[in-house]
Amino acid sequence: NYIEDAIKKGAKIIVSEKKLLKKRPNLVFLFSSNVRKLLAETSQKILYKKPKKLVAVTGTNGKSSITDFYYQILKLNSKKVASIGTIGLKYKDKNKTLDNTTSNPVYLSFILNELWKKKIEFVIMEASSHGLDQNRLDGLIFDVGIFTNLSHDHLDYHKNMKNYFNSK
């Protein structure tokens, strides 16, 4: 099992949604009812410096387009802006491919901290339903949230429209 493998590899702290049955010497065990949420919030606290304004765009369709339009409008108005999403990480003249529309919380915290170091003031990011449901954006405070639309999609993951809507 994963916990045993982690201990064998030298882990000193275990964070789990399951209670450990036996105590172990030199091992700290932390229980959390939502490990993903804890990871996201902790990541944001450790790498807490980020651009001044954060904007999230969610919805079934149009996230990438709206994110890119918003990015272009701010850039044309000489704002120090970045965008994060399906089309990657864009800022200044850089464009980096990302693995997911909404990155994992540790990597996202790192990206935001790096953008802050580069004096970026505005970040527009896509907030996918998977990313929201998996708590990847927890710990972030958005200045603006944009909801494009909701249609029958991603039901293989969310199972029904109510769950899909609630993730948004």
Where do the language-model regions lie?
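Short, basic phosphate-binding NTP loop
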Residues: 1-58, 65-82
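Short loop/helix-cap segments at secondary-structure boundaries that form the rim of catalytic
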Residues: 18-27, 90-92, 135-141
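Ser/Thr-centric signal marking residues that sit
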Residues: 58-60, 65-66, 86, 102, ...
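Short beta-strand-centered segment that lines the nucleotide-binding/catalytic pocket of NTP-utilizing
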Residues: 78-92, 128
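Short, charged, surface-exposed secondary-structure boundary motifs
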Residues: 24-26, 39-43, 92-94, 154-159
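Short glycine/serine/threonine-rich phosphate/pyrophosphate-binding segments
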Residues: 63-69, 127, 131-132
